[in-house]
A protein has these predicted regions:
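Catalytic center-proximal scaffold of phosphoryl-transfer enzymes
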Residues: 1-385
Length: 385
């Protein structure tokens, strides 16, 4: 999977995490160590965007959700991407100042919308509005917006989000023969024209609400009261600078649906199984699951891909070892045994071209071979007749 990430040309990637217990790390089960290292373990997923020409999903087993553990898993991205789309977890802040320095962080706008939706539907306002006529609703909004009522302000914000996502849907699909760069430029122009004014209006409402709903401590906003409205305002104010990156880059999505969908099978497995016993088990799971999910994203048969890759890898190791045996007097007497020794396979495959078996490369090659076979069969048909 590292080869897939290293060879993916995408400059904007998505990340998400989900809990997955490892008993060995929690000091429980038959594999428990002498000391517990963490009471909560995680799986971190990194994926390409939904419209990427090089879709993939990569999992990493984490001892904890600390910035150090996440940073170790994401170190591979340093210097490879421009923007990472994540949630509002504070650990990502230190990463962008450290190991991922130079990479921009876009917080999911869809998460901000969820916070506002939860706050808007937690009271009786929606129920009361449904009992009013359209004219009475307009008057209700006009009066309460002037008074700065939180519930009405949040409904206005929710309407703004609906506009933003509606505008985004208008340019979501690329045009025929449109390049990725041209599509991103068209999206950016659309956002600057239509989305930015709405976003700025939403930001102005939150800035005003923050005066009564939050307090600032050491650069972070905290809720004054334990209410859904205060939580929504706090989330926006703390992530404010990282929610608007998409306004300057048409490649950056507003959501992370791809990685959330890809991580769902892991969550289902956790619900049914509960945990893995050992660290090795967690690493194996993190290695196998993304192979299947990446194959699904690329529309290919993972078994066929792995068979082709395994045959090519073994052939490479076999030919390399026998060539060494023929050309070196110090070679072992039985080179075949060394080929079958897994301890030496990594060395034998050190110069194997894994890039030929990237899902999108392998798929393109298979499609080209199928077209060639069809053309040859078409040419041979008249001769056989």
């Amino acid at each position: 999977m590292n080869a897939i990430v290293e060879n993916c040309p995408d400059k904007v990637l998505l990340a998400d995490e989900t809990r997955y217990g490892v008993l060995e790390l929690q000091g429980r089960g038959v594999c428990k160590p002498a000391d517990k290292t963490s009471s909560s373990n995680w799986m971190l997923a990194v994926a390409a965007k939904h419209d990427s020409m090089h879709p993939f999903i990569r999992f990493s087993a984490l001892k904890s959700c600390s910035a150090d553990d996440i940073g170790e898993a994401l170190a591979l991205l340093a210097g490879r991407i421009d923007t990472l789309v994540v949630d509002g977890y504070a650990g990502y802040v230190s990463l962008m100042d450290g190991i991922l320095q130079g990479i921009k962080r876009q917080c999911r706008l869809v998460h901000a919308r969820r916070e506002v939706y939860a706050a808007s539907t937690s009271g009786n306002l929606v129920k009361a509005l449904l009992e009013l006529s359209p004219e009475e609703r307009v008057e209700h909004f006009r009066k309460n917006m002037r008074d700065g009522r939180n519930d009405v302000c949040l409904l206005a914000v929710l309407a703004g989000f609906q506009l933003i996502f509606g505008y985004e849907a208008e340019v979501a699909e690329s045009l025929p023969d449109e390049t990725e760069e041209a599509h991103a430029a068209r999206i950016l122009t659309h956002r600057q024209t239509f989305v930015k004014p709405v976003y700025e209006a939403i930001d102005a409402i939150f800035m005003e609400m923050a005066k009564t709903q939050t307090t600032q401590v050491k650069g972070r906003f905290r809720s004054k009261e334990d209410t859904q409205a205060a939580k929504a305002v706090r989330y926006w104010m703390n992530q404010r600078e990282h929610l608007k990156v998409f306004l300057e880059d048409g490649r950056v999505p507003l959501e992370t649906n791809t990685v959330e969908r890809a991580i769902r099978p892991m969550a289902v497995l956790r619900k049914n199984k509960g945990f893995v016993q050992s660290i090795d088990g967690a690493k194996t799971l993190a290695m196998c699951m993304p192979l299947v999910e990446t194959a699904k994203l690329n529309g290919i048969d993972v078994e066929e891909l792995l068979n082709d890759m395994s045959k090519a890898a073994f052939k490479h190791a076999y030919e390399k070892q026998w060539t060494y045996w023929y050309t070196n007097e110090e070679a072992p007497k039985n080179p075949t045994r060394k080929i079958q020794d897994w301890a030496n396979m990594a060395e034998l495959l050190s110069d194997f071209n894994w890039a030929d078996y990237l899902p999108w490369v392998w798929k393109a090659r298979k499609e080209a071979e199928a077209r060639l076979q069809a053309e040859l069969a078409k040419q041979a048909a008249p001769q056989m007749a």
